[in-house]
Design a protein with these regions (language model features):
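Helix-start/capping segments and mature chain N-termini
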Residues: 1-108
Length: 108
């Protein structure tokens, strides 16, 4: 379920103030969805309790770390494996439309 990222501006800080995530995840579950994909003004941020990766043209992409993204432990490990395997990988700023061309999308 695609939702506006309504959280406070320092999402990179893990805190007990995850009410925005919880409320939107509850809405998603009520709508029959397992996860939400948040964005700010069309720019991908992260899932409700996860980071997002996608593949397009044989390259793996994930949004770069910013104040809108919590640097998850699993995200870090996935990036380490990608680099160890020398796979094509880019961190950057990606929009909702980038996912329309993706061959696969996953949350960590």
């Amino acid at each position: 379920m695609l939702v506006d990222d309504i959280r406070w501006q320092r999402c990179d800080i893990k805190s007990t103030s995850l009410l925005g995530n919880v409320l939107q995840m509850n809405d998603a579950k009520s709508a029959g969805c397992n996860e939400i994909l948040m964005h700010k003004n069309g720019e991908l941020t992260e899932g409700g309790a996860s980071n997002i990766f996608f593949v397009k043209n044989k390259t793996i992409f994930t949004p770069e770390l910013s104040s809108n993204i919590l640097p998850g432990i699993t995200r870090h490990q996935v990036i380490k494996i990608i680099n160890d395997k020398k796979l094509n990988f880019e961190e950057g700023s990606y929009g909702i439309d980038d996912l329309k061309e993706a061959s696969s999308i996953w949350f960590t």
